[in-house]
Amino acid sequence: MKKTILLFAFAITLISCDKTTETKEFKTAYIDTSKLLDESTEAKDIEEKFKDKSKVMGNQLEAEVTRWKSEAANFQKNAQANGQAWAQQKGAELQKREQELSYAQEGMLRQLQQESGTELDSLVTSYKKIIKDFGKEKGYDYIYGTGEPASILYAKDSYDITKDIVKIVNDKYKST
């Protein structure tokens, strides 16, 4: 009887040791976000739009600065001829205009940063949705992002789906 129980226990031990433990492997990938923004047609168009807008606004401001420099040069020529009271008044006016030009430049930069930031934030939000939908469709458990600063220090190139996402976002942008 003891031998039967011992043999039965030994058989159960063998059977339990023979079972393989199920391990679920996760399907993962990563996207180089810097590359995504560099190669995205929409991101390039946004960048170009704000370069052009900056150039137009800068040209307007530059014309004002040129006028101010011309007045400042005339001021220096005429200061001795027109007297000290005139020079003080005109100097104060020129200083005030210089400060106004400085404020205008700061305001222009702030406006451009705010507008471009809003558009880029909207772009990033839409890209996150596209990536999420792509991940669900392809059965990914995790999709990581890397770029500057790098959050992934190493991954096999086979896990890089940046090209796939760039193609999707560019195709979607072309269709709109």
What role is predicted for each listed range?
Residues 151-155:
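A structural signal for short loop-to-beta-strand junctions that line the ligand-binding cleft
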Residues 13-16:
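C-terminal motif of bacterial Sec signal peptides marking the signal peptidase cleavage site
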Residues 6-9:
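Sec-dependent N-terminal signal peptides
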Residues 21-138, 142-150, 174-176:
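Amphipathic alpha-helical segments
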Residues 122-126, 156, 160-161:
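Charged, alpha-helix-enriched surfaces in structured cytosolic catalytic cores
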Residues 1-4:
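Positively charged n-region of N-terminal signal peptides that target proteins for export
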